[in-house]
Design a protein with these regions (language model features):
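A short alpha-helix/helix-coil micro-patch that ends at or immediately precedes a cysteine
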Residues: 21-57
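Extracytoplasmic/secreted envelope proteins and their assembly/folding machinery
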Residues: 18, 38-45, 49, 63, ...
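Secondary-structure capping and domain/repeat boundary segments
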Residues: 13-19
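Cyclophilin-type peptidyl-prolyl cis-trans isomerase
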Residues: 71-130, 150-153, 162-165
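Single conserved hydrophobic/aromatic residue that forms the stacking wall/gate
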Residues: 1-12
Length: 171
């Protein structure tokens, strides 16, 4: 996967955006919160349009909590500093609860967003330390199917859960 030296320029316009994330377990439709997290949505949209997430796995799956992906190394460690090659600031304007289907950026501390994201499997009381930028509106059963896979001691699925493609739509 290509590394970038800095975050992409704003490519999104004053519209609403959605995505279809196609996995080997089914499809999920995501509606993005462009007003709450424009920089984060722009980051995800631009990476997805470049095919960045294609063939990347969900490397961390915790049933009763969340599913996490977006690291091309497939480890959860490759994003920080290496992928996508930059970090950007949190957008913590959104005080939505972390409910099933909420999509947020994974990070290793304040202002360390890159390409990794997680999708909530269930409602969970997380601190507002993660930029919430979207919500699954169709395909919640896909989250359940992914969350049901067997994992190792590090929460990595024993069978690959693959993001086959991400299709972005402007509405």
């Amino acid at each position: 996967h290509e590394r970038f030296r800095r975050q992409r320029q704003m490519c999104i316009r004053d519209r609403s955006y959605s995505a279809i994330i196609k996995t080997n377990f089914g499809e999920m439709k995501i509606e993005f919160f462009t007003e709450d997290a424009p920089v984060t949505v722009n980051n995800f949209v631009s990476l997805a349009r470049d095919g960045y997430y294609d063939s990347v796995i969900f490397h961390r799956v915790i049933s009763g909590f969340m599913i996490q992906g977006g690291d091309p190394s497939g480890t959860g460690h490759g994003d920080y500093g290496k992928y996508p090659g930059y970090e950007f600031e949190d957008e913590l304007n959104n005080q939505r609860p972390y409910e099933k289907g909420i999509m947020a950026m994974a990070n290793r501390g304040p202002n360390t967003n890159g390409s990794q994201f997680f999708i909530m499997h269930v409602d969970y009381p997380l601190p507002y330390s993660y930029t919430i930028f979207g919500q699954v509106t169709e395909g919640l059963e896909v989250i359940d199917s992914i969350a049901a896979v067997q994992t190792d001691a590090a929460d990595k699925p024993l069978e690959d859960v693959v993001i086959e493609s991400v299709e972005i739509s402007e509405n």
